[in-house]
Amino acid sequence: MPKLEMMLLVLLILPLPYFDAAGGQAVQGDGHGDGMDRYLQRDDREARITCQPRGRSKWGRCCLTQMCGNYCCYKHGCRCVYHSWRGHGCSC
């Protein structure tokens, strides 16, 4: 099964609380980043996945593309740019 079809299937199966409104998948760790490391190692995920811990919380957000500010870019190969009037955005 191609990666896109597999990802769509997973998105349909997982309940919505696992995802946050900004488009990244919320991942629960143990406060030291180990939970996010285990998430990245599962299912041979690519090394390009970026994760962002949330301070002292056990939760963080992982993107399958690139994280830009609080959001995930919609495809690979994008750059994160900052516009003074709009904030962070992806340039693809």
From Swiss-Prot:
Q: Is-annotated flag, keyword Signal?
A: yes
Q: Which cysteines are joined by disulfide bonds?
A: C63-C72, C68-C80, C73-C90, C78-C92
Localization (cell): Secreted
Specify the signal sequence span. 1-24
Task: Cite a single GO MF annotation.
Answer: acetylcholine receptor inhibitor activity
Post-translational modification, briefly?
A: The homodimer contains 10 disulfide bonds.
The alphabetized UniProt keywords are: Acetylcholine receptor inhibiting toxin, Disulfide bond, Ion channel impairing toxin, Neurotoxin, Postsynaptic neurotoxin, Secreted, Signal, Toxin
Pro-peptide positions? 25-45
Tissue specificity, in the record's words, reads:
Expressed by the venom duct.
UniProt entry tagged with the keyword Signal: yes
Q: What is its main location?
A: secreted
The source's domain of life comes to: Eukaryota
A GO cellular component annotated for this chain's UniProt record is: host cell postsynaptic membrane
What does the similarity note say? Belongs to the conotoxin D superfamily.
What is the role of the protein in this entry?
A: Alpha-conotoxins act on postsynaptic membranes, they bind to the nicotinic acetylcholine receptors (nAChR) and thus inhibit them. Through its two C-terminal domains, this homodimeric protein would bind to two nAChR allosteric sites, located outside the nAChR C-loop of the principal binding face and at the adjacent binding interface in a clockwise direction.
Complex and partners: Homodimer; disulfide-linked.
> What is said about the domains?
The cysteine framework is XX (C-CC-C-CC-C-C-C-C). Displays a mini-granulin fold, a structure composed of two short, stacked beta-hairpins connected by two parallel disulfide bonds. This newly described fold is derived from the same cysteine connectivity as knottins (ICK fold). The name 'mini-granulin fold' comes from the structural homology with the N-terminal region of the human granulin.
Name-wise, this protein is Alpha-conotoxin FrXXA 2
| Annotated organism of origin | Conus fergusoni (Ferguson's cone)
What does UniProt list as this organism's lineage?
Answer: Eukaryota, Metazoa, Spiralia, Lophotrochozoa, Mollusca
